[in-house]
Curated annotation (Swiss-Prot):
Keyword Lyase on entry: no
Any one of the GO CC terms: mitochondrial inner membrane
Subunit comment: The cytochrome bc1 complex contains 11 subunits: 3 respiratory subunits (MT-CYB, CYC1 and UQCRFS1), 2 core proteins (UQCRC1 and UQCRC2) and 6 low-molecular weight proteins (UQCRH/QCR6, UQCRB/QCR7, UQCRQ/QCR8, UQCR10/QCR9, UQCR11/QCR10 and a cleavage product of UQCRFS1). This cytochrome bc1 complex then forms a dimer.
Gene encoding the protein: MT-CYB
Name under which the protein is recorded: Cytochrome b
Cofactor binding, per record: Binds 2 heme b groups non-covalently.
Binding site for a ubiquinone: H201
Localization per Swiss-Prot or TrEMBL: Mitochondrion inner membrane
Gene3D superfamilies: Cytochrome Bc1 Complex, Chain C
Primary site of residence: mitochondrion
GO BP, one annotated term: mitochondrial electron transport, ubiquinol to cytochrome c
Cofactor(s) required for function per UniProt: heme b
Length: 379
């Protein structure tokens, strides 16, 4: 008798994706982040669902409903902090996942990579709208500043902003629609993640060497399921430690003050995971230029496959490219730091130099270095 998991219409999809999937025998722990992102998404959807049961998307009661969740709901504080810090863990896994893709040349799978870039944009949009919901000072002013950037678009900019706000400022209608979008987007993310996996399984996984692994495959289960479970345990350990010992470490104290349109906070800044893009935005004195640079800082990832000039896929055997990759990582950390600093000397010039270096590395320096490495190896 044939095994049910191989014949049943639903079970055979799961079987071919997670059980009998042929996987390269040499993939390292850097390949764990896909499953960790799936776990993060499940945590966010579940905690978000329970929060939505008690939250009210009204400017008069939003802030007090979050207070009510933390004080009066059974384990409400735990659910709220799991959701807030779960977003941080989501972005840590996301950045490491993208970094691994850049380092090992996974971007050569064009469809998978482009869906991934689309996923990154969607997750960023979801996180931004979620940050507005508690209706604290930073929620209100962050929403005002970021949505107002759309007014830089020629001709339709100001109309577009008023259309998004549903009025002349961020108000009740804006909060209600942000809550609606924040609720629906994670399910769209889940669907996109399914498409992401579909395209990945068309080609099979990449591996650290960047060479074809068709001659040496092993079963996904039990080898990589066990490996993924270890990663999940470490993720949950880190998340629970953060939630139980230092839940406000990554938050902003200003968000514990009720939103007040008449009182601007001294330093308006987004959550830590947007600071690198925020620093690039602030580095350009022109509004439209800043907005374009902000969008391009993420959209540049879609160009990476076309800038690949090396004859090797992975950076594993390319020491010069490796050095440049780690310079890029350091540059992004510098931008993250700058994004959280006030707009004054010397932070302005450091931010501008780091922004220039970011675009130069990806668009010019790394492709030229790859060509030089080809010549050094006489290819």
């Amino acid at each position: 008798m044939t095994n049910l998991r191989k014949t049943h219409p639903l079970m055979k999809i799961v079987n071919s994706s997670f059980i009998d999937l042929p996987a390269p025998s040499n993939i390292s722990s850097w390949w764990n982040f896909g499953s960790l992102l799936g776990v993060c998404l499940i945590i966010q959807i579940l905690t978000g669902l329970f929060l939505a049961m008690h939250y009210t998307s009204d400017t008069m009661t939003a802030f007090s409903s979050v207070t009510h969740i933390c004080r009066d709901v059974n384990y409400g504080w735990l659910i709220r902090y799991l959701h807030a810090n779960g977003a941080s863990m989501f972005f840590i896994c996301l950045f490491l996942h993208v970094g691994r893709g850049l380092y090992y040349g996974s971007y050569m799978y064009l469809e998978t990579w482009n869906i991934g870039v689309l996923l990154l944009f969607t997750v960023m949009a979801t996180a931004f709208m979620g940050y507005v919901l508690p209706w604290g000072q930073m929620s209100f002013w962050g929403a005002t500043v970021i949505t107002n950037l759309l007014s830089a678009i020629p001709y339709i900019g100001s109309d577009l902003v008023e259309w998004i706000w549903s009025g002349f400022s961020v108000d009740k209608a804006t909060l209600t629609r942000f809550f609606a979008f924040h609720f629906i987007l994670p399910f769209i993310i889940a669907a996109l993640a399914g498409v992401h996996l579909l395209f990945l399984h068309e080609t099979g996984s990449n591996n650290p060497s960047g060479l074809s692994s068709d001659a040496d495959k092993i079963l996904f289960h039990p080898y990589y399921t066990i490996k993924d479970i270890l990663g999940v345990f470490l993720l949950i350990l880190t998340l629970t430690s953060l939630v139980l010992f230092s839940p406000d470490l990554l938050g902003d104290p200003d968000n514990y003050t009720h939103a007040n349109p008449l009182n601007t906070p001294p330093h308006i800044k987004p959550e830590w995971y947007f600071l690198f893009a925020y620093a690039i935005l602030r580095s350009i004195p022109n509004k439209l230029g800043g907005v374009l640079a902000l969008v391009l800082s993420i959209l540049i990832l879609a160009l990476v496959p076309f800038l690949h000039t090396s004859k090797q896929r992975s950076m594993m055997f390319r020491p010069f490219s490796q050095c440049l990759f780690w310079i890029l990582v350091a540059d992004l950390l510098t931008l993250t730091w700058i994004g959280g600093q006030p707009v004054e000397h010397p932070f302005i010039i450091i931010g501008q130099l780091a922004s220039i270096l970011y675009f130069l590395l990806i668009l010019v320096i790394m492709p030229i270095t790859s060509l030089l490495e080809n010549n050094l190896m006489k290819w």
